């Protein structure tokens, strides 16, 4: 089939929808993107927030881009502005509250007898000397041999351990055991975190709270419900990978919309390499109410002697005329939005496929919320190098991350795996009081349906599960067919979108 004649609708202009459409357009196709709102980026978008009488360009902030995320890096290298972000080796503080009294003020090393007894301050980074040795071990080999990879892996783990500061030896020993265990004992998808870690007999409360915090922030799931397989994937990518920059964190000086969503939408208008590198065809404020499918024979479109294929139309809110027909539909929505759309579309010719998709979507865990409290901090300005992220751990209650915003006096306090907005705000108030985080002004951004929890026994639907109906799935809750078990994240969203784009493109050849 002539690629110019292939009609593709991408529903949703989040990171998944935009990246899928961009890759399709790069391949010479002409997708149309339909977005219900006026703003692109989905749940990873920019926001204009007023703090202290000044408007700051921030974002909804709940997504962390941590680890060797090849798909993000590939797209960012092609479309992003390198001045907007850098990848750096992790370097963050851990403050572990041991009691009920006030802890030290954020960003200040206040040392009183009360503070020393109630809050343990630590630091976790990678030793640069061992990172240099790791680079030598890998050499310039794109595919290093088994011995080189084993040596590089050992050096990577040692770099973490040597870079740790003020962490008790017992806790450090258990962290080392955890890293080895994650690499050598991959669990099943049906295995719970607590069952998987039971043989380690972890005793130190710091390690226990750190694991719980990792489940909350990376898997958006309470530890008792968390999937061991996806936790092990996070541990292996972040702390037990032979790749030199596997654990590097992205530090951006712009909001998430400016980082990648808008560049994907706008393309590379200055590029001479690709004829299709211009802006995507975006239909904003176009809510798709219903999918309408009719099976037609290819001869109706110029072919002969072939089985009927689905042709799709879209019913758009506020429009009497249907959009279409389309040869392919890419659903790049949240599970809840996709389910509502599919249930409204069950009367079409492909009802069996849609009913199966609706059943699969209804089986996914309900999303939990994430609170990001953007604060204008009341403290002496520090350079970006001096302002480290902080992991705030308590003996009871939710953990939180405090992320300083590059180039400003703002910081985001992030609480994940939350079930209620009011309770999340109360937890944030307690954490601020407990750790002495003083702000001049703040603004709470609560994403009620932030990400699908990575509960044990849950498998992500495959991106091509419904390819026979020319219906494709893209999103952070979709499997990309690689066999890697990532939690719901921006990277998993991009990987599923890439898989969709490649599959549709391959079908044209």
Q: Which stretches of residues belong to each language-model region?
A:
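Glycine-rich FAD pyrophosphate-binding loop
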Residues: 25-48
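Conserved Rossmann-like nucleotide-cofactor binding loop
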Residues: 16, 39, 336
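Mobile amphipathic helical/loop "lid" adjacent to a hydrophobic cofactor/ligand pocket
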Residues: 73, 77-78, 82-228
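Helical element adjacent to the flavin cofactor pocket in flavoenzyme catalytic cores
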Residues: 237-318
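Conserved flavin/dinucleotide-binding core of flavoenzymes
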Residues: 48, 106, 121, 127-128, ...
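N-terminal Rossmann-like FAD-binding beta1-loop-alpha1 element of flavoenzymes
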Residues: 6-33
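Mid-domain catalytic core of redox enzymes
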Residues: 27, 286-425, 429-430, 434
């Amino acid at each position: 089939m002539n690629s110019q004649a292939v009609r593709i609708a991408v529903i949703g202009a989040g990171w998944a929808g935009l990246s899928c459409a961009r890759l399709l357009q790069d391949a010479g196709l002409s997708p149309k993107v339909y977005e219900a709102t006026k703003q692109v980026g989905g749940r990873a978008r920019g926001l204009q927030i007023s703090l202290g009488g000044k408007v700051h360009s921030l974002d909804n902030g709940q997504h962390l881009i941590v680890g060797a995320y090849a798909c993000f890096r590939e797209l960012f290298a092609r479309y992003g502005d390198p001045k907007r972000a850098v990848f750096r080796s992790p370097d963050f503080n851990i403050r572990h509250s041991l009691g009920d009294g006030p802890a030290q003020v954020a960003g200040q090393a206040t040392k009183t007898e009360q503070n020393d007894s109630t809050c343990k301050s630590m630091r976790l980074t990678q030793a640069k000397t061992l990172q240099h040795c790791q680079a030598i071990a890998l050499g310039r080999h794109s595919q290093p041999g088994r011995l080189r990879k084993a040596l590089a892996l050992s050096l990577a783990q040692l770099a973490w351990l040597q870079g740790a500061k003020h962490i008790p030896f017992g806790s450090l020993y258990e962290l080392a055991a955890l890293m080895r265990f994650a690499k050598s004992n991959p669990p099943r998808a049906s295995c719970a975190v607590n069952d998987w870690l039971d043989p380690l007999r972890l005793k130190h409360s710091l390690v226990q709270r750190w694991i719980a915090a990792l489940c909350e922030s990376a898997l958006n799931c309470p530890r008792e419900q968390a999937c061991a397989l996806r936790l092990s994937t996070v541990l292996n990518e972040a702390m037990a990978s032979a790749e030199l920059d596997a654990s590097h964190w992205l530090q951006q000086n712009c909001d998430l919309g400016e980082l990648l969503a808008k560049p994907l939408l706008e393309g590379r208008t200055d590029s001479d390499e690709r004829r299709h590198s211009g802006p995507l065809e975006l239909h904003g404020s176009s809510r798709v109410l219903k999918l309408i499918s009719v099976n037609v024979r290819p001869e109706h479109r110029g072919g002969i002697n072939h089985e009927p294929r689905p042709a799709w139309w879209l019913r758009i809110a506020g429009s009497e005329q249907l959009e279409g027909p389309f040869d392919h539909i890419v659903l790049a929505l949240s599970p809840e939005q996709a389910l509502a759309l599919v249930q409204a579309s069950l009367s079409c010719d492909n009802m069996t496929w849609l009913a199966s998709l609706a059943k699969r979507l209804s089986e996914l865990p309900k999303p939990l919320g994430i609170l990001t409290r953007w604060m204008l901090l009341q403290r002496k300005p520090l350079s970006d190098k001096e302002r480290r992220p902080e992991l705030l751990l308590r003996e009871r209650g939710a953990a939180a991350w405090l992320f300083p915003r590059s180039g400003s006096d703002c910081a985001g306090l992030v609480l994940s795996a939350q079930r209620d907005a009011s309770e999340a705000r109360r937890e944030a108030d307690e954490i601020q009081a407990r750790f002495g985080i003083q702000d001049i002004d703040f603004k709470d951004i609560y994403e009620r349906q932030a990400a699908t929890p990575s509960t044990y026994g849950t498998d992500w639907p495959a991106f091509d599960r419904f390819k026979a109906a020319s219906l494709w799935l893209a999103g952070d809750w979709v499997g990309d067919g690689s066999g890697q078990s990532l939690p719901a994240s921006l990277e998993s969203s991009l990987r599923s979108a890439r898989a969709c784009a490649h599959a549709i493109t391959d079908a044209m050849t």
